[in-house]
Amino acid sequence: MGENETRFLSLSGQGFQLIRGTVMAEKKEFIRIRGARENNLKALNVDIPRNQFVVFTGLSGSGKSSLAFDTIYAEGQRRYMESLSSYARQFLGQMEKPNVDSIEGLPPAISIDQKSTNRNPRSTVGTVTEIYDYFRLLYARIGIPHCPKCGKVISRQSVDQMVDLIMALPERTKIQLLAPVVRGRKGRHEKVLEQAKRSGYVRVMIDGSQYELSEEITLDKNLKHNISIIVDRLVVKPDIEKRLTDSVENVLDLADGLLVVDTMDGNQLNFSQSFSCPDCGISMEEIEPRSFSFNNPFGACPSCAGLGYKMEFDEDLMIPDKTVSIADGAITVLGWQSCTDKSSYTRAILDALAEEYDFSLSTPFCEYPKKIHDILIYGTNGKSVKVHYRGQRGVGVYDVAFEGLIKNVERRYRETGSDSTKQEYETFMRVTPCQACHGQRLKPTSLGVTVGDKNIFEVTSLSIDNLQKFMQNLELSEQQLLIGKQILKEIRARVSFLADVGLNYLTLARGTASLSGGEAQRIRLATQIGSGLVGVAYILDEPSIGLHQRDNDKLLATLKHLRDLGNSLIVVEHDEDTMRAADCVVDIGPGAGEHGGELVAIGTAEDLMKNPNSITGKYLSGELKIPVPSERRKPTGWLKVVGAKEHNLKNINVNFPLGVMTCVTGVSGSGKSSLVNEILYKRLARDLNRARTIPGAHKDIIGMEQLDKVIDIDQSPIGRTPRSNPATYTGLFDQIRDLFAATQDAKARGYKKGRFSFNVKGGRCEACGGDGILKIEMHFLPDVYVPCEVCHGKRYNRETLEVKYKGKSIYDVLNMTVEEALEFFRPVPSIFRKLQTLYDVGLSYIRLGQPSTTLSGGEAQRIKLAAELSRRGTGKTIYILDEPTTGLHFADVHKLVEILHRLSEGGNTVVVIEHNLDVIKTADYIIDIGPEGGDGGGTVIACGTPEEVAKSPVSYTGKYVEKYL
């Protein structure tokens, strides 16, 4: 065997193979991908440089995610899984082999996407980043316990420590050792006094006065008493240590580990063998890390089980309009809607109450006096009323103690076995802070432990900025420093990573369910930096979402730091700054869907600008750009939010212009979502759409009479099952089925519209239930989905497919792209109009029957936009969008801007929360919230046209938008 040659073992899926080969001297420089065909990829070949910061870009739907997540990440994960035993694999869930010929030089892959945010109410920023675990350890090791009742410091000492402290008193000090046997308890306590006398003790201290046990002692049984047995009297001098130790042990036995030393000058020293308060008698268990976990019974508040809140039925949701009478349907909660029917049992109960307490059911609910209101809501307090009810067995009179609406509905909620009924009841509930822990989630004894004068909840409720200051200024004793040094080092490092990714406004106590996709992703990014792994391929999905331009530099510095550690970074991104900062940009396209899946260009941002085929390059170079409107439209009216103070909003008044497009801007965490989503949308939804929502804290909204409905167009899926698709969501499928049912063939066979649905029996293939595929469980291998062998994936039975419209079956039509269908249905105006809007929003490439589960968030949002555009507007609608540019390329943003202006042209109002400067510069009006995130935000910094905001010296948004105008 030659010098450069060696034999080495290669691990393959089939077992070990002995390969004779040459060991390469240099390390593999690239991740080499050959023949990638996942989703719309067209046998793509690409060499991605390793240990570099690589950006994948291209139009929405071009195949970026198919290459990054479905090919590179999936194969990296699969190879790791393959190295495990089949026993271990069955617990991990399997990954299918991606449709690719080969991938070489692939490092272990870690995906940080937006979808896998934990929605568990127990999950917080602190628990996800594991910083909270370090804080639990810190508090358990160096925390100072306090009595939760009186606030005094609680400490515990051994007998030797107690003796040493007493011996340290000035010599000749007269002391008496007291055993506190009764603390703050009512009663005569004859047995206690008798027992003390029998044990040979002579004196007791009762309520601060000294008594001889030989005298008659009578106590008032209705008063609380404190009784201490005087065990010994001593004068402090060197030779008393032996006697003192014996006496101290006696006291501790008598008083369950407590000792009070009374110096004759009136001072008292309290000692405890365990963590207990000598004054209040409250004792604490051993302090451990689990004492500070709200997910563990040892630490969690017993009342709310550590959630910090309770779901409780809300009177305002059960009776939304109090100007209506009960007879006219004021009570809308489940089970009581029937009380408008005079023959119902609920009405019979209310009639009986009205007769007993002399009130009318025809009176508007808001006019009832407090007594009647409380009877209806909270019950009759056990008092019965005579209910006359005509049932199936005739008329009966029943004695009923009315429990009140809230108790009644709570009982029904507990007793129902139906999940859907439970969900319906939950729409009448609101989240209220737990009365026992006031939202702090832990037991009082755990909240009594402090470090730097703050308990663990107070520390985790500080913003990351303030937490960093707290950690820097923390003053600890020498012993505390010695114990906590390593823990503090870990906490400081992890907290600084969160600040580095622009999350300095968040708190560790913030629930992860309330985080945006971008925030959740950046938190996981910070956690990964903390882990310090090297030689890994990190695959990220638009980490810049929700990040203001001001904080972009921080994020880019973090990404470069990950790269510099020795990792490969693959970032799916549309942000211009990120592309310019990358070592390499991979442009996939040229179009979307069928027209994408090819490698258009690869190289630096400068290389892309020179490439005539790259649309991305043309936008980067400025050859293509989104134009600034020549004039800004004038508002047709105003909507005024008064006294907004949800979360960090500082009791502000905000004017929203009507009939135009408004952008609400500001740095991350400034209060944009609190203002628009929590207050504006929820209040309008409640008042205009009659939705059961509770708006955020505010005084009022003036001008709602100018609107007739509010629509929130978000990026949530258009359906949760593969049975929903763009055709069903937009209403196209109904019209297409009408067309098929109207054909001569369908009429001759007697087929109605329902025959052409794959959701009901009749026309669908029954072998697969209209799914077109069958799932085969493989236990420790991944489940295999195979096309149905009866219909061959077409979802319908043979007879249905024989009915043709213009030579195409219903399956053929569902398989068409929007572009193909547009040409096919040109003669049918109602269908053509809906297809045209789908085409206009940039979805020419999606298939009409494409399962909604395969659509991205951006695609789902644009389908919703298309559905809105195709409706005939009233000119009184307000549309609310939260970061609609997520997942959109420059070219897609161009289309989106045109759509948003089309929506507002008919007199409708569009309110957009956005960081994308191309959208902001085209807005008619900007409301800039800030100036900072968290506590430093919550005020209106600037408002007006983009030109006016650009002149503001205090607006960060103005500074950046000025360059785009």
Please describe what each predicted stretch is.
Residues 2-965:
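Conserved phosphate-binding elements of NTP-dependent enzyme cores
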